[in-house]
Amino acid sequence: DAPSLGRVIDYCIDHGAAAVCLPAYGGEFYKLSDAERIDVVRLAVNHSNGRIPVIGQANHPSSRIAIDLALQMQDIGVDLISVAVPRVFGLGEDDLLRYFIPLSNALSVPLLIQDFNPGGPTVGPQFAKRLHEECPNFRYLKLEEPMMGSKAAGIIEATAGGVSVLEGWGGMYMLELIPSGICGVMPGVAAFPVLDRAYRLHIDGNIQAAYEVFSRILPFIVYQLQHMLLKNYQ
């Protein structure tokens, strides 16, 4: 539905989003064929026409296919590539480095890695340091887990600021992670204007006001995170 996608992108631009990322988990990428995912990215790049950075999400358990998708998206004109850690199998960090190093080296745009693993461990400071040393265009790590303040700070320290940390999971842990140095939040479109206001209030030192704004959107986030598809029935 190209017209609807265009309206969503316009909404993001009009409300001050820093970038758009698609098709990701919230956009139900797993229901699209690889060709459809490329079409979605092409529509976004063409419609945005340089008005907002576009992040192409190239998730795939096969590194070869992820590289192919990422290169197609790069050729279309995305500003950054995002790839989720393949959590189909129990992979250690050495295995994940073997997955991501060829992918990152194939790209000329920056790489964002998303680690969405509600049932297990996520990558940490040493992984970020090793991959960033090998692949300087690995610039962002999006984590989605509770109580990760020390991990976020550790990643930033281990990479000397070369890798920035983004908070996912709908923005639920945003306020507790701002003091740890996260550079932003990647929520779904519906919640982002309110979260953006709370984020800006907090970084400006208006912590109580940020909490009051955040507390109004938190029930919505909790409801939505019970199941990804619930956002379709709000």
Per-segment meaning from a language model:
Residues L230-Q234:
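A mid-to-C-terminal "edge-of-domain" accessory segment
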Residues N105, N117-L229:
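Catalytic alpha/beta core domains of metabolic enzymes, predominantly
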Residues D1-G120, R130:
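Active-site beta->alpha loop and helix N-cap motifs at the rims of alpha/beta catalytic domains
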